[in-house]
Amino acid sequence: MASDGRIVLADSEPTPGDATGIAAVVATLVERILEQGPDNLDVGGIGIGAAGFVDVDRATVRFAPNIDWIDEPLAEAVGKLVDLPVVVENDANAAAWGEYRFGAGEDTDDLLFVTVGTGVGGGIVHRGMLFRGGFGAAAEIGHLRVVPDGRLCGCGQRGCFEQYASGRALVRDARARVESDDPQAQPLLMVAGDGEAITGQMVTGLARQGDPMCVDLLRDVGQWVGEGIATLAAVLDPRVIAIGGGVADAGDLLLDPVRRAFEEHLPAGEHRRIAELRLAALGNEAGIIGAADLARTGG
């Protein structure tokens, strides 16, 4: 990545099933990109966005829910193979930093980034610094409990934010409408062919075409997102809130109900300055750009 946030060269490889092979895959990608680049390509370090709890040292993944990593010294493992400095950061934190530096938050020094995808993630930039907490695991906003004794979450708790305000929740609720033989679900069933084949992209696509049920489903998710970020804003008081992730591809179909619920549920909203809500600007590249910039600048 260039210093202005441009991705100069890109490549990809599937994540191996065996977590012990990930360092080798990263090293292979680095070597391949170096081979593709010009002779004067200057690479100062490697940034890795990892979906999990990353220790304050930005080197060790303490736990990853979808990869068999526990106390994984990822920076050391990759560094031994590529002979370059390595910085590891939580993937949502990296995306937040990317949006702050080069995207939706580049005109502020105070940003709350919320990613609404399969789950809910986030990152906090305060006074131009990425807020990581005392142990490196701050901003796990998807596990803010919003419904006491609510739906069981993969983290082991019940009622977490992401159980109601995520792509997973959107699909679950859409399938429930199909299984209940709701007549409004017929257009979605015709697209999917089967309730189990429903995806968030299908729901969003039909919502864009004006399908009433799919518009309602996105409105429900937006309502939950808005209520959740109102609670977060009461604690963090951000200037800008950027919303990204796959569900955010729905644009105003999601953002309008988010904004309404946010303003309705923000404590004492009529007596305070209210954060500006924006759609994230960098899409799926936010984490790549943020991780690379953290490796370059240290964040």
Q: Model-found features: residue ranges?
A:
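A short acidic/small-residue loop/turn micro-motif
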Residues: 14-17, 69, 138-140
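Generic enzyme active-site microenvironment
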Residues: 89, 97
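Short, charged low-complexity linear segments at domain edges
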Residues: 124-140
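Short beta-strand segments
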Residues: 47-51, 113-119, 123-125
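A charged helix-plus-loop insertion that forms the helical arch/lid used to bind
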Residues: 59-70
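Active-site glycine-centered loops adjacent to acidic/histidine catalytic or metal-binding residues
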Residues: 91, 117, 291
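ATP-binding/phosphotransfer module of carbohydrate and carboxylate kinases, centering on a glycine-rich
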Residues: 1-45, 55-58, 76-86, 101-110, ...
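Short hydrophobic alpha-helix segments
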Residues: 11-13, 65, 134
